């Protein structure tokens, strides 16, 4: 399996200047080969990498940069081009690769060779070819059987330097259980970040203080003369405020996704178009700050790492559809309780959505039929849902499903098993 481990570098002022020079040289190499790409047909990363030795004869600065680093710069350009083509094939509107200005290119990568971890003087240091030894805050050990494949050195907008080790371990991820015992459906939101089928609701992270400090720092920056020493000092303060927000949010998402990946055997979530949701009018700031896409990506790779089934289902109608009988009924966003006009089933709005997500996830990944050896909890769930058809209408209703009616007006009573299970989960 492949993992990334990130550590803080503590270079001296001289080393930090040399690292910055290396980054800027790599930026110029990137722009050089981008210029060639725009003027030359039928080029590839391999053919362009073969030009580096001759380029060093005319460009003396390149002799101070490790050969593998320069090769990765060219590879990075063509990886970006491949990503751009892939998005275009998927129907996205794309432009062209852009020339990198100073400050827009912040990292360089060693691969296969040119680096080594040392601990001869009681403190761990990273040795990099052409650069020397750099002290590192080695706050956690790498796995004993891990092999370092790549070393990426990156400068954050705050001016801090970090190193990311790309390591490979020989073991395969654990096998996913054939008959999962603990299954959970997760509905994400803004006020309650997650609400699952076990009745667990996690409140969204409060970032109001961090946002207030960021806005105050941005106002101070707007009053500085652009490019002055005071402007640069305040720019770093703004970058630090952004970093505070990012770290607090990522810490919250890492802990939450780690909990679900390790606690359950089967996790079902909505396949959300996070970018499309942010572009919708109204409440875009809260949607962007929720970082649902980041949470789902974290949850997916951690489920793969821990041997947990992960399935993303179509989110359409999960809130409107009744988890008991399958009838769809419109409800405004401010209505936080689900009350079915067909069967009378009542539950928290998010709990009802979570059960629908779990139902769709089980059908998508494990099939619509039931296994003889599934857990009693899942047996109860299937008992509650086995009579449901794919249609969204009940057997018989007195009024249309869009009309708010009393449950006694409805002939079909739904399934009491799921009603009892969900009601008990919500009350916990």
Name these PLM-found stretches.
Residues 1-72:
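Gly/serine-rich nucleotide phosphate-binding loop at the start of the catalytic core
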Residues 160-184, 338:
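A short acidic-Thr-Gly-centered motif at the start of a beta-strand
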Residues 50-156:
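Acidic carboxylate diad motif detector
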Residues 163-170, 240-263:
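Phosphate-interacting basic helix/loop segments used at nucleotide- and nucleic-acid interfaces
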Residues 2, 286, 290-428:
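Positively charged, low-complexity nucleic-acid-binding target-recognition regions
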């Amino acid at each position: 399996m492949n993992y990334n481990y990130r550590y803080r570098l503590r270079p001296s002022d001289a080393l930090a200047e040399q690292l910055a020079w290396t980054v800027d040289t790599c930026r110029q190499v990137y722009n050089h080969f981008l210029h060639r790409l725009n003027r030359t047909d039928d080029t590839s990363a391999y053919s362009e990498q073969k030009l580096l030795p001759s380029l060093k004869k005319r460009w003396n600065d390149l002799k101070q940069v490790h050969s593998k680093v320069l090769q990765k710069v060219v590879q990075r350009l063509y990886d970006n081009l491949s990503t751009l083509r892939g998005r275009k094939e998927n129907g996205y509107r794309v432009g062209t690769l852009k020339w990198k200005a100073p400050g827009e290119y912040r990292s360089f990568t060693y691969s296969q060779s040119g680096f080594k971890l040392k601990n001869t003087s009681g403190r761990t240091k990273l040795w990099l070819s052409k650069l020397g030894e750099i002290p590192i805050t080695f706050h956690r050990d790498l796995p004993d059987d891990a092999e370092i494949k790549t070393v990426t050195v990156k400068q954050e907008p705050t001016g801090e330097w970090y190193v990311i080790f790309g390591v490979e371990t020989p073991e395969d991820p654990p096998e996913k259980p054939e008959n999962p015992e603990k299954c959970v459906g997760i509905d994400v939101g803004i006020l309650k970040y997650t609400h699952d089928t076990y009745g667990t609701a996690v409140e969204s992270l409060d970032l109001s203080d961090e946002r207030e400090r960021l806005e105050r720092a941005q106002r101070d920056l707007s009053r500085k003369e652009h490019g002055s020493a005071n402007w640069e000092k305040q720019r770093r303060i703004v970058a630090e405020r952004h970093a505070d927000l990012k770290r607090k949010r990522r810490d919250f998402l890492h802990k939450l996704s780690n909990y679900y990946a390790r606690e359950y055997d089967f996790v079902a979530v909505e396949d959300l178009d996070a970018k499309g949701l942010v572009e919708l009018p109204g409440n875009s700031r809260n949607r962007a700050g929720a970082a649902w896409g980041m949470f789902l990506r974290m949850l997916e790779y951690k489920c793969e790492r821990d041997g947990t089934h992960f399935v993303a289902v179509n989110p359409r109608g999960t809130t409107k559809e009744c988890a008991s009988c399958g009838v769809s009924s419109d409800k405004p966003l401010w209505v936080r309780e689900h009350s079915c006009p067909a069967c009378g089933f009542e539950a928290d709005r998010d709990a009802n959505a979570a059960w629908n997500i779990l139902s769709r996830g089980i059908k998508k990944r494990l099939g619509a039929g039931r296994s003889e050896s599934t857990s009693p909890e899942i047996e109860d769930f299937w008992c509650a849902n086995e009579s449901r058809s794919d249609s969204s209408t009940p057997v018989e209703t007195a009024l249309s499903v869009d009309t708010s009616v009393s449950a006694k007006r409805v002939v079909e009573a739904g399934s009491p098993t799921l009603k009892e299970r969900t009601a008990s989960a919500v009350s916990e």
